[in-house]
């Protein structure tokens, strides 16, 4: 376990590790326990009762945060002709086809999200071994393989975030910055929680949401009582 600094240890004293806090209280604690000297990201981790090894219990999707993440994503779109023009008009940072495939194969990664039209996936598929491990491969489940490239770009720029269950059954999602108003962080949290409830696989048995933790960059984790979140289930 890495050695923790004095500020972190002082922040940790403010947290009751055995308690699951109401979301409003948890957000307040995240701000009080933030030890970073920059505008830290606030992230939520969900431990879900699923077996990711089973194909029918895979969870992957995307949700538009009502107040964004505090960061504007750089979007690369693989498209041709009119669709390329639509992507450019919508605000995509990079639009093209084979030239960007070649750049990525040579180690270029100045982007955060990749969108592709379905007709481009034959070519983009060549990048699977490069983009896949980085979580950047376009996927219909996240709305990043689509002919409606304008909508995809606009949603991503507005604060759309992807989520994907890892091998241990966890999902990590950024919900904003510590500088955000508490209410905005709570509403972003609720949007993510509602999306995950809707994404529950039919094959999942037992307790679905096992544990929820909210934290800031470099700050301690704070358990959240998800029943205090008002969402339409």
Swiss-Prot record:
A single GO cellular-component term on record: large ribosomal subunit
Keyword Ubl conjugation appears in the UniProt entry: no
| Database matches in CDD domains | Ribosomal_L1
- Cross-referenced Pfam families, in alphabetical order? Ribosomal_L1
The record's annotation in Gene3D superfamilies points to: 3.30.190.20, 3.40.50.790
User: Which keywords, in A-to-Z order, does the entry hold?
Assistant: Repressor, Ribonucleoprotein, Ribosomal protein, RNA-binding, rRNA-binding, Translation regulation, tRNA-binding
Q: Which domain of life is it from?
A: Bacteria
* Single GO MF annotation: rRNA binding
Q: Which family does it belong to?
A: Belongs to the universal ribosomal protein uL1 family.
Protein name as it appears in the record: Large ribosomal subunit protein uL1
Gene name, Swiss-Prot/TrEMBL: rplA
């Amino acid at each position: 376990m890495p050695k923790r600094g004095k500020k972190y240890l002082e922040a940790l004293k403010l947290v009751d590790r055995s308690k699951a806090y109401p979301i409003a209280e948890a957000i307040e604690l995240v701000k009080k326990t933030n030890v970073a000297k920059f505008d830290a990201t606030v992230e939520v981790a969900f431990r879900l009762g699923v077996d990711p090894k089973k194909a029918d219990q895979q969870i992957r999707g995307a949700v538009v945060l009502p107040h964004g993440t505090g960061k504007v994503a750089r979007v690369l779109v693989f498209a041709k002709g009119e669709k390329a023009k639509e992507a450019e008009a919508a605000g995509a940072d990079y639009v093209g086809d084979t030239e960007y495939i070649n750049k990525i194969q040579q180690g270029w990664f100045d982007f955060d999200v990749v969108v592709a039209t379905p007709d481009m996936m034959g070519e983009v598929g060549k990048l699977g071994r490069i983009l896949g491990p980085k979580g950047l491969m376009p996927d219909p489940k996240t709305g990043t393989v689509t002919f409606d490239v304008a909508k995809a770009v606009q949603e991503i720029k507005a604060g759309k975030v992807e989520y994907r269950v890892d091998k241990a059954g966890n999902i990590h999602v950024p919900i904003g910055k510590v500088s955000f108003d508490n209410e905005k962080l709570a509403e972003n949290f609720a949007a993510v929680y509602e999306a995950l409830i809707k994404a529950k696989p039919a094959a999942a048995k037992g307790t679905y949401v096992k544990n929820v933790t909210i934290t800031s960059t470099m700050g301690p984790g704070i358990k959240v009582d998800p029943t205090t979140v008002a969402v339409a289930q």
